[in-house]
Amino acid sequence: MDWGALVAATLRLYQQAGKETWQKVQRSWWVGLLPLLYAPLFLLTARFVAPLGMIGGFILGLVLALCTSSYLYFLAGVVNGNRVRPQDLLESWRPYFFSVITILFFLTIVQYALALLLTPTAGAQALIALINLILLIILNPIPEIIYQGRSEGLNMLQESIEFLRDSGVEWFLPFVALAVFSFFFFPLPILMMPLQIGRLAFPALGVGGAFWASPGSLVSAVISAFLLFVLMVFRGFLFRALASGTRRQRVFRSRFS
């Protein structure tokens, strides 16, 4: 393997993904505002179902899955170059709902199993932290696999593992670099989200809580929502480029580009 050529091909791939992201974000900028619609919906639902206990948690999970499915629908349209319109909102909740709910159900089962099987000791907490870290890594490309991958159901986990085995370094490198930059120089929580989004917890729902409480909160929420949009579109293009071939194939193609 020509490592110099691989580095050059990878940098060119990042550059191309960034260029495509800039073009698509300009064309469909309004999609960046959608989290400001999902957040109140989720928070109002949480308030109403809070007294219902486990049933309330189930309902809240369904609403979370609907919001995430809708957002992925619009991301898919942007990344695939399709025309996306606000009118599509009514259709957007359905296409990826079952894929999203499958992953959320898997995570719920894992958390319940850990709570039942492990006693609350220091060693158990360390094991739980390790398992959660592994899940964070394995699930990271799941949003892109949902709307670009070839698998359904729990087979998406296998596809994610295969993708990370082949292209994990190239996938995580820009997001780790962004997180480090944010931690030391620009502490904006949303910049950490590309490393956490695989759990489908939809970070934009936290852009705010009551982001309408003050002008400053609203401005912060809008900025966070747009940054999330830009990062997710970049992830979409990066995933497509990395999933289209092996490292050797990318090096070979870069020689003719």
Predicted regions and their residues:
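Hydrophobic alpha-helical membrane segments
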Residues: 1-257
